[in-house]
């Protein structure tokens, strides 16, 4: 059985806030292998609302592997830090909010760094509304 890590991508995100999460999970998997432990595969998905690439604050282009319309499991969803004011990204990526709510209802776990926490906060605030 695989561990499913989903990395949400946004324009103007801090690239290291996403790539570091992927590297940490791959490192943990490598350490398990080196220690001769039973190793759970790590499946990492890079997701955007439409499956298209994003441009990070450092000018890197990151290609998504999936869109929100695709069907896949997530054990952990990682939300990146955004460059400067997160409000424009929250508006531009509004489609993430209902999707995050749905994942929360499926008992998915979340991590977020820096300004990425605002997406979780907005999604959870919306859970309390009818």
Where are these regions (language model features)?
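Catalytic nucleophile serine of serine hydrolases
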Residues: 114-116
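A short alpha->loop->secondary-structure connector
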Residues: 126-130
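Extended, subdomain-level signal for the structured scaffold at the beginning of enzyme domains
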Residues: 1-110, 119-125
């Amino acid at each position: 059985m695989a561990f499913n890590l989903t990395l949400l991508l946004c324009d103007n995100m801090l690239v290291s806030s996403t790539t570091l999460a992927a590297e940490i999970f791959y490192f943990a998997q490598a350490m398990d292998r080196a220690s001769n432990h039973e190793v759970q595969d790590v499946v990492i998905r890079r997701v955007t609302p439409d499956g298209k690439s994003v441009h990070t604050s450092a000018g890197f282009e990151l290609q998504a592997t999936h869109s929100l319309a695709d069907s896949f499991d997530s054990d952990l969803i990682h939300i990146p830090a955004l460059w400067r004011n997160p409000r424009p990204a929250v508006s531009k990526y509004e489609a993430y909010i209902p999707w995050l709510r749905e994942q929360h209802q499926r008992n998915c776990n979340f991590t977020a760094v820096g300004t990425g926490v605002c997406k979780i906060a907005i999604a959870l605030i919306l859970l309390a509304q009818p």
